[in-house]
Amino acid sequence: MVLSYSDTRRLLELVGKDAIMRETVSRLRQGLAEVAGGKRQKCPPRSGFVIGDDAGEGVIVNMPYRQDREGMTLKTISYKPLNNSTNWLPTVVGALNRYSDETGELAAICDATIPTAIRTGATTAIASSLLARPGAHAVALVGAGLQSVTQLHGLSIAFDMDVVRVYDINAVRAQSLRERCAFTHARFEVADNPQTAVDGADILVTATSVRPGAGPVVRDEHLAEHLHINSIGSDEPGKTELPRSILERAFVCVDHIEQALAEGECQVLDPHQIDAVLEDLVFDAACHERQLPQTEQLTVFDSTGFAF
């Protein structure tokens, strides 16, 4: 079976974006709880290569996951920050390859661009539902590319958003976000700078293509005491979106400790400064059905992405 980018777009239309996002959130939440409960294995850290001689040209990484007696799925994903401007392609592209456990044969190939964006948005929805203040309604976005759409889509399922403030270095891209997000009736405001977008926000998503060494993209100034931050843009050594001071005073949750320390926001921290792993919070919430006390303090979710 071969599913192209066009095929995945068509599936979204046939099944419905809301239905797919809700199902992804539900299955991911269940799966994370199963990892924490010992019913599923945690995937190994991803491996890959930095592209080119200069920092910021991109990376290509491999993310494997095997289900016993079923098969192995290998996602190869490439991050090329200039892809959109030079090749009219998304900055994140890749492929999902499914191998049979019985025969070892390649059984299916699927373009990974849309599934990756949906999965990342679903993870943000889960992390935010646990760490953001209940009733959060003001969302800030720094970065308005493809990922920003599914980030907002996931959040729209978990929260009743009424205002979205967006900043992007490309003003046209920021202006176009409203029409790309027909799933929400929230009011959209385009900010002149990142700090204006963040001012008064309950939830912040940073989804940028900042070059290694060029961050952070926001300052540690005038942040709401209860602000929850989802940082999804850090994916290689030297590339960070947040000031270290935010991480050092926040409750920090990661999706994969080894990856976060190697290439996520937490690459500037020591292991003991990481407070939680997402699957443990999901498992705890499922077992005890209680609100976490961290929802009233500054929290950060360091999202690096992992096979599942």
Report each predicted region and the residues it spans.
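Glycine-rich Rossmann-fold phosphate-binding loop(s) that bind the pyrophosphate
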Residues: G143-G145
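Adenosine-phosphate binding glycine-rich loop
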Residues: R9-G16, E236-F308
